Amino acid sequence: MSGKPAARQGDMTQYGGSIVQGSAGVRIGAPTGVACSVCPGGVTSGHPVNPLLGAKVLPGETDIALPGPLPFILSRTYSSYRTKTPAPVGSLGPGWKMPADIRLQLRDNTLILSDNGGRSLYFEHLFPGEDGYSRSESLWLVRGGVAKLDEGHRLAALWQALPEELRLSPHRYLATNSPQGPWWLLGWCERVPEADEVLPAPLPPYRVLTGLVDRFGRTQTFHREAAGEFSGEITGVTDGAGRHFRLVLTTQAQRAEEARQQAISGGTEPSAFPDTLPGYTEYGRDNGIRLSAVWLTHDPEYPENLPAAPLVRYGWTPRGELAAVYDRSNTQVRSFTYDDKYRGRMVAHRHTGRPEICYRYDSDGRVTEQLNPAGLSYTYQYEKDRITITDSLNRREVLHTQGEGGLKRVVKKEHADGSVTQSQFDAVGRLRAQTDAAGRTTEYSPDVVTGLITRITTPDGRASAFYYNHHSQLTSATGPDGLEIRREYDEWGRLIQETAPDGDITRYRYDNPHSDLPCATEDATGSRKTMTWSRYGQLLSFTDCSGYVTRYDHDRFGQVTAVHREEGLSQYRAYDSRGQLIAVKDTQGHETRYEYNAAGDLTTVIAPDGSRNGTQYDAWGKAICTTQGGLTRSMEYDAAGRVIRLTSENGSHTTFRYDVLDRLIQETGFDGRTQRYHHDLTGKLIRSEDEGLVTHWHYDEADRLTHRTVNGETAERWQYDERGWLTDISHISEGHRVTVHYGYDSKGRLASEHLTVHHPQTNELLWQHETRHAYNAQGLANRCIPDSLPAVEWLTYGSGWLSGMKLGDTPLVEYTRDRLHRETLRSFGRYELTTAYTPAGQLQSQHLNSLLSDRDYTWNDNGELIRISSPRQTRSYSYSTTGRLTGVHTTAANLDIRIPYTTDPAGNRLPDPELHPDSALSMWPDNRIARDAHYLYRYDRHGRLTEKTDLIPEGVIRTDDERTHRYHYDSQHRLVHYTRTQYAEPLVESRYLYDPLGRRVAKRVWRRERDLTGWMSLSRKPQVTWYGWDGDRLTTIQNDRTRIQTIYQPGSFTPLIRVETATGELAKTQRRSLADTLQQSGGEDGGSVVFPPVLVQMLDRLESEILADRVSEESRRWLASCGLTVAQMQSQMDPVYTPARKIHLYHCDHRGLPLALISTEGTTAWYAEYDEWGNLLNEENPHQLQQLIRLPGQQYDEESGLYYNRHRYYDPLQGRYITQDPIGLKGGWNFYQYPLNPISNIDPLGLETLKCIKPLHSMGGTGERSGPDIWGNPFYHQYLCVPDGKGDYTCGGQDQRGESKGDGLWGPGKASNDTKEAAGRCDLVETDNSCVENCLKGKFKEVRPRYSVLPDIFTPINLGLFKNCQDWSNDSLETCKMKCSGNNIGRFIRFVFTGVM
């Protein structure tokens, strides 16, 4: 196909006469715009080589990128590939191209477009006003000569953005890869004619890039010299914001003379530096003119303070090859070496501070070997339609290809493990299907004209559909579950409305027709936020829904230098000459400083008190050791960059082994515990081994987990509905069938969670618990209906800021907030809690109208809490240089006591040297504490505590009265049986049941008691306690006497309201539903009848509306159609009994630890004091209330003294867990450790949210970053991972769609395909928080915004219009943390300093 319209005006018909009206939508003929080769940056390996071309490539290195509309981005690409029709060598030398090197060659019947990758794209000749479309490259080439394009043409609107003289000129050509632009203007250079030249001079047989024009009419202009030795060369650029850049050029003679002068001044022998260069290279004609430096000469925003040095400078070999790149601080950041014989053929390169990578070529100029002295090396073997790649670990990969030139594609890939994947492409090289190693095929349906994906069908037959407007913008997408997102755009192609799958609508407003930056956004709640922008597109101010303003300051390079928020909070940032962040200062002047090595790796963080934390790196920038407060952790890597050994602060080691595809297959921990992993052909985990426990994992066709078996016995089962939503998880716990059922509304939002427990023998329902969720019209989850309680309604303002809480129709809690939306006053009846903050945003005080509970907080310069003062007592805290709590000094009227906390280097508790001076213990290398001052401990091979026995001091006569605690676990390492004995007699025994998510649902406790005969033995009948949950939060505790229910602050583990109901009262609330009543007496003879499920749902909804006295019009119409009234239905309902309930407010400390229970009358009904690790020190409980909540997420078990902590049990005496972290190293290096600063940090679950990064291989790196660009901005791919509830992680990120060249640097985005295991490094960014995790899982499913190559400081901030991977992950995390912040002061402070507010 030629890519020309099927019927063009002027074409002749078979029987004569021309066509008057053409069709722009259908293309005819042989393909046009086909490239001579595949894209150099497409398929790459190593550092990097394109094996399809056999070429050494560097797909993109950015030297200049200042923010603004149509910014001047100077980036370099290199390819050793040589096209047969090259353009002349550009100003960066042979093999190198920059965007301005685009050139169009005009030949008799062919147009040859030379792109900035060194390729040639071949188009047919174009008539004036005609266009050619390259389907393989998604690129339009249009010849001027008409005022308008056909109305149906995709480029019609973009064409009208051009000045009329450009549109009407038949001598100009224009190219674009998107209907949104920009246009690349291909014209000619105006020149001064020679004296004897005949005028008018003919136009040259080529066109060069003269500028860019976007859809708003903004321009970027390339200024070319009209006369002299640099005639036709670019010597200046004016970007879209009005900045002027001067490009300093040199000739070979000038460079030779400069080299001779440097040799003379340096007293050295001048090297051979010829005055001229050969006029032709393998890369095209060469005039010897090179770019020496780029200066910023005019800056409209900073006219008086221009940089005194060039933004970038280049060094050259005597043969005119690019040898070095220097950044704006004059630091050399890149160096290159070339073949002695073939000019421009790169044989080595390096980033400053990184090893040199070398390359060897065969006689045809193809790379045969890539040599890496500090990592993997590769060899390449070329055969017809087959390339074999072998690395230095002897792993072989074979690529099978079809097609030639620009249509060559990899159709089959043989992996190192022998597995094979295959791909199918259409006639123009677009992906149509992929078959994985298991033989399963995913099909892709691209649009015939645009190539945009319109449908994806997965191997299980489920499909996703995508729809676009005439300008190739996504207008709607429907997932396999039927949920849909929709987008609307204005006439300029700007997003004006987006509808999420749950129906939430976000609107965008614009006040400037020449800008794509919104002036306001409006979310689903109707809350409006406004923004103002600089001429460079930088956010200057952000006004939230309440009218509160945040202001931003920037430097000339686009970096944020200050953020000013309400309430006087400001943050200041400083940068060095390379643009690296070197200092952050808060409002109080507390400054944190940063230091870097030559490669740009962060080596030192200096805290405000001067303490230093350092990191050392290997040759590739991977951290090999970190030192904090004199304690060091180290990491070792193999040649493939995989971690193979960790060395803890104690000198103990964890080792790792991998398969040939870099998947982890064995991990041996610090204590010798070994775990092994096996994967199927597609990479899914199918078998894991853990010291005798063998788990098999089973999946359905959609790769959803269906069940697991452990040692041959079924563990959990997962069930899904037809939409793919999880509906049930079940397993057997201590013989009981335990199931969790999930219900959803029509928008896919969780509506209910129903837990059931059945008897092992009779299948009798022993326990059930349901939590329901409801959403308001704006999509906020503002209602929760706890089991057997009235609805809990959260009252909000703006975009969801909490202002109050109601239980049923009764308001209970009210909140007052400041201009930063921080809580300043909480009211509960007569109870009032006033909260104040320091100028730096830290918690300063919490004062009650009951003075005895007042608290004041004092912080040091490092942000550590050093004192809590109250009328009862004062506690002062001391820390080690690693931030660990080392001591507490408590003073009161009759008390003055110091308690030290001593740990080994890895954080394991040691005996206090003052109290136990004779102790020889200095560390626990395996992190298993075997003894302390009170007990002896034993562990099994899984590292689980199995026995704890009283320690009998030496010299004490043994009487065999020591107490022994024994712990027994199931195959999932959950405590299921506990006993405590003395004199070989049981004192207490307990057994525990769990649901398939690992949440405890019941415990049975037998205690020693005297029977009727006077004999002491365990009770025959256990005391049974049942538990109910809302996600990861324990909300219900019920025994035979009472039910206690807890309502937590939204998104946190901090309890807010306690509701206690006598069990006898609960029995009175039992009633039939309306549906049950009608079914029991609805038969023709008065007997029972079974209603269809749809009718039951309608009756349930009607009943809930009647009970709430809010019957909808829809329900009234339905009843009327049946000849019924609301009153009639109400008369059929069983009466509702409201039980007597005791309601108390939890008064908690800054961590969420309950300190008091406040009655509705404002009196203190219960009060307690704890030590820093959650041990109860004192309790005032006149009403005998049961208050078992301890540190967030913890429940006290009286029988064992342990605190149940969701995934495991916490021993408050040791300040650590009794089993290892179920997520292993993902939760930290010490698997037993609770946060070592418990007064500031909490761990409600023992899991966490991770921020992961990995290299952009296209940027040439293999470590956690690929090296800085010349102004110091690190480029790496960043994404987030959260626990998936199945013992693993699910990840999400932002990626450039990259389906065609038309996607561009600011093209459509897509969800990245990431895994936790593939990361170069993952860092903990949020301790366990189910609200954050669930919020992020929702973010992972959302359609991505448009991709931006620049970070947020260059493009819209926190608006989601343009995002690179780093900004998307940062903003998603901060948004979810904000939604889930509740009253967590520490988290709020972090928000303030990360720009969320």
From Swiss-Prot:
Region (28 X approximate tandem repeats) residue spans: 330-1186
Annotated stretches, region: Disordered: 1292-1312
Parts forming coiled coils: none
Keyword Disulfide bond: no
Disulfide-bonded cysteines: none
InterPro entries: DUF6531, RHS, Rhs_assc_core, RHS_domain, RHS_repeat, T6SS_VgrG/RHS, YD
Sequence intervals crossing the membrane: none
Family: Belongs to the RHS family.
Domain notes: Each rhs appears to consist of a highly conserved 141 kDa amino fragment followed by a highly divergent C-terminus.
Task of the protein: Rhs elements have a nonessential function. They may play an important role in the natural ecology of the cell.
Protein's UniProt name: Protein RhsC
Gene: rhsC
